[in-house]
UniProtKB/Swiss-Prot annotation:
SUPFAM superfamilies named among the record's database cross-references: Cytidine deaminase-like (SSF53927), Methylglyoxal synthase-like (SSF52335)
Top-level taxon of the source organism: Bacteria
Comment field on protein domains: The IMP cyclohydrolase activity resides in the N-terminal region.
Descriptive protein name: Bifunctional purine biosynthesis protein PurH
Xref: CDD domains: IMPCH
Annotated source species: Parvibaculum lavamentivorans (strain DS-1 / DSM 13023 / NCIMB 13966)
GO molecular function, one term: phosphoribosylaminoimidazolecarboxamide formyltransferase activity
Family from the record: Belongs to the PurH family.
Amino acid sequence: MTSSKSHPEAADIQRVRRALLSVSDKTGLIDFARALHGAGVELISTGGTAKAIKDAALPVKDVADLTGFPEMMDGRVKTLHPKVHGGLLAVRDDAEHAAAMKEHGIAGIDLLCVNLYPFEATVAKGAAYDECVENIDIGGPAMIRAAAKNHAYVGVIVDGADYAAVIEEITGKGGTSLVLRKRLAQKAYARTAAYDAAISNWFANAIGETAPDYRAFGGSLKQTLRYGENPHQVASFYVTGENRPGVSNAEQLQGKELSYNNINDTDAAFELVGEFDPKLAPAIAIIKHANPCGVATGATLADAYRKALACDPVSAFGGIIAANRPLDGETAEEIARIFTEVIIAPEADEDARRIIGAKKNLRLLITHGLPDPATAGLFYKSVAGGLLVQSRDNGRVDTLDLKVVTKRAPTAQEMEDLKFAFRVCKHVKSNAIIYVKNGATVGIGAGQMSRVDSARIAARKAQDAAEAAGEKTPATIGSVVASDAFFPFADGLLSAAEAGATAVIQPGGSVRDDEVIAAADEKGLAMVMTGMRHFRH
């Protein structure tokens, strides 16, 4: 039940006489505790935090001595006590609150420092169900919310990055300011919200609930970006803690800060190369505006890069490059010849680091792993007043999934290229048409409102690339073609045949499939249907 009672206005600067510290991450704890002690602050603590402070030869009162009640049930119950929550929630200038504190022997707690049990990290490492449950913090969030509610009098720290600001105010102003306490309270509520979001989403996954009645979202700020897609837009980069190798948890070895567009494109590039098993062949993807302008496998990583670049060397300028194997010196030399924004790879050898190091603005990201294209996950898209949530497109097809629908079946080489093309198709904005030859894209048509236009654009770009390379015929001659969705009419397929394609892969499912199949037979094309669509918007 809420109270409608009004309280006296608190002073801006609140003196800190007593602080309760209870942290899982003890980074910076001792220096912080020492500074508080030096400022005359009484320290109260729990369990391992109290032991760490005592081991540093600093005076500290155990919370059990404050409450008169021992920790119990393996530490599940230690701070859930009126002497703790009363000390955090009491309105200091309210006569009734002050009388209650005196009657029950409750001392005010002016500063709370808590970071929570590492639930997110426990889940990320793949811990068993029971271990995850034991890392759900109860007392910590309760104290944090209490202190944040009473921010008029109490400061609350949930992030060691704020230790310095608090000490600076205590030593410089004699206490914490209301401005600082409000900022800390906002951060505290955001932290508990993100923590609860992680727990609720973990539970949903554990029980196979794909559409819970309530879905919580949380994340922590990784980077404040200079701007968004355009300079007039404000932007930030938040990470959710999902244990999936990629731009969110990559190590940046060099280069300028990533921009909004860099992050978006780098994610698209690395997710694409994750489609190709590094044990089978090295692969390279070159991305511009979240669309590939070249994808290839090769005998070596450098060979794959050269083949990917040949698809559309003009668009590759200023692009993002992703590799599915460690970056080596030969590949780095090739990449360094043109302007590139970002390289992302599982690792980079010494030669590659040295070569890329000469390009001071070129960003090099190392992930120590590849995203698994088969892993389940969620994809979010904002709409006015809501969010669309769908599972990650982890659909894949293999030879046994394909249905040959034409008189001629694909050759072995055509079949390999068809499967390659359909994997790439999944990562191209719809409507998508992809021409592939010998394990490399040779023409990409993306994002057109009609499928036939995408087919024509892809063929035209292949023609342009051939002319730029001084070749008489485009690489689409003798290629295969993939479509992310069915051909609604035969025109798109006929355009591909005119460009020189010899085999087609597409989902099928059009009311005019028979017409499209007949057109393929007339042109001598082999065609397989996947039964799986790969729209991407």
